[in-house]
Amino acid sequence: MNLVMVLAVYATISKALGMPLRHPGTQENYHALYQCTDTALLSRALVWMATDSRCANEPFNITNGDLIRWENLWPKMASYFGMEVGPRQHIKLTEMMADKASLWDRIVSQHELRRIPYDKIASWGYGDFVFGAGFDIISSMTKARRYGFHEVRDTEEMFFRMFDDLRASKMIP
């Protein structure tokens, strides 16, 4: 599942509709602690697990190692996409985004983006899952640290780096 694509496409479509960037989750979700995992970090952790004999048959949690709250990150995301922050509004992305394929096709043509079918570009159900959680989502990295994996990533930097990568690869305008 790719939360970065959900956020990027949601912001792009909201902007095209002239809407502010509204947090689509519950009020509790907006204030809860949340963790993410950078795919490059996960790849490095998988190599570590596969090559360190102490890791054989051991389960590990792998996250960036920091915590975010959407309430702190949301204004920065809005700024990144050149948008105002809208009021938080619990939105079912699966419903709101269901009829936006033709709009997405126009955005793709207008900005000469890569043509990826709309139903493949973002997992709105995953977005509903992430933004529907009304509680902290925290996984302990203690075991991985005890076994020797100490790498971390800054989640805010991760999001903006990935958004930059999506722009550079013509996935979003």
Where are these regions (language model features)?
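NAD(P)-dependent short-chain dehydrogenase/reductase
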Residues: M1-R44, M77
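C-terminal/domain-terminus segments
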Residues: V6, R145-P173
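A broad, low-specificity signal marking well-ordered, structured residues that form hydrophobic/aromatic
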Residues: L21, F60, F149
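Mid/C-terminal beta-alpha module of Rossmann-like enzyme folds, strongest
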Residues: C36, L42-G127, S140-T142, R146, ...
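A conserved mid-domain beta-alpha-beta active-site/ligand-binding segment of alpha/beta enzyme cores
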Residues: V130-F131
